[in-house]
Regions:
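Expand to "…catalyze enediolate/carbanion chemistry for C-C bond making/breaking, isomerization
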Residues: 1-298
């Protein structure tokens, strides 16, 4: 698992925001070459991103770059510019199907070999934000071993579906849930869509908690104020950790050791799926702790 509770976007042509990247406590910082950069600014943004890959990650965040999709004819130029040391992954905008992913995998391998980077070291993150992308989410996710996460993009999805984007998000429910299920089926992390009403903290937290229950483990963020609540919501609570420790202890001592398939804990049945879920919670907490400790040393 890669810790991705917060995926914070910075326009690739915004020198001021990039200069603050090392101070930004997001798990993932994504330098953007797509929608937040006007066409005329793309060449400048590519240069700026390439020059700041190591700097942006010097505060301990993992660095991704969002690239333009193949249909724009800008993808190769983006990749030629940014595949260098310091880059951990690329996010492919408007992923339409597995052929898009395979083509990206091939290009990344060619660049890794040409530039002396470890083959397979650069991960792929898929932005699922069209009707076609939603339908092909699972085939796309398994099209390359590099794929480690899927982001649901609500803004472009609602545009493609010709519906209004709302804070309540009822119009997104099918696609949002489908993306989370596709990610889990492929063994990837599901990253929730950006919440555009960034000043409405209460609504953001409510929406994020709902997404967590759909299976999302992180969120694409557009404002620094969203980082702290995202970390809080996507990190198992102390109560959850205590519950998980208790489940593991009781099941191992009273179940596994005595040949029982189910035991009782806090008045509820605990069987193998509950036990495995508890172990997953503890593993997540351990990985988050290791990630945060590494950040402090950066």
């Amino acid at each position: 698992m890669t810790v991705m509770r917060s995926v914070f976007y910075i326009p690739g042509n915004n020198e001021k925001m990039i200069s603050k990247a090392p101070e930004t406590p997001a798990d993932i910082i994504t330098l953007d070459l797509e929608d937040s950069v006007p066409p005329a600014e793309k060449p400048k943004a590519r240069d700026m991103v390439r020059e700041n890959l190591k700097f942006a990650g010097s505060g301990g965040s993992t660095i991704f770059v969002r690239i333009n999709n193949w249909e724009t004819l800008m993808t190769n130029d983006d990749l030629e510019a940014i595949v260098h040391e310091g880059l951990s992954g690329v996010c492919l905008a408007k992923t339409g199907g597995p052929d898009h992913v395979q083509r990206l995998d091939w290009k990344l391998e060619e660049l890794e070999r040409r530039r002396g980077l470890k083959v397979g070291s650069i991960a792929i993150q898929l932005l699922i934000e069209t009707a076609k992308g939603v339908i092909n989410a699972y085939p796309s996710a398994i099209a390359s071993k590099r794929v480690n996460s899927l982001i649901f993009g609500a803004v472009d999805y609602t545009k493609d579906m010709r519906v209004k984007l709302t804070i309540e998000g009822d119009e997104q429910l099918y696609a949002r849930a489908h993306n989370a299920v596709a990610a889990r089926a492929a063994g990837c992390i599901a990253i929730d869509c950006p919440f555009v009403a960034f000043k409405d903290t209460e609504a953001f937290e409510k929406n994020t908690r709902f997404g967590r229950q759909l299976g999302y483990e992180g969120r694409m963020l557009i404002h620094p104020s969203q980082i702290e609540p995202s970390h809080r919501i996507y990190t198992p609570s102390p109560e959850d950790v205590e519950w998980a420790k208790g489940v593991v202890k009781v099941f191992e001592e009273e179940g596994i050791a005595k040949g029982a398939a189910a035991v009782s804990y806090m008045g509820k049945m605990v069987d193998t799926p509950v036990y495995e879920n508890a172990r997953t919670i503890l593993a997540i907490v351990e990985e988050i702790a290791a990630f945060d400790a590494k950040r402090k040393k950066a």
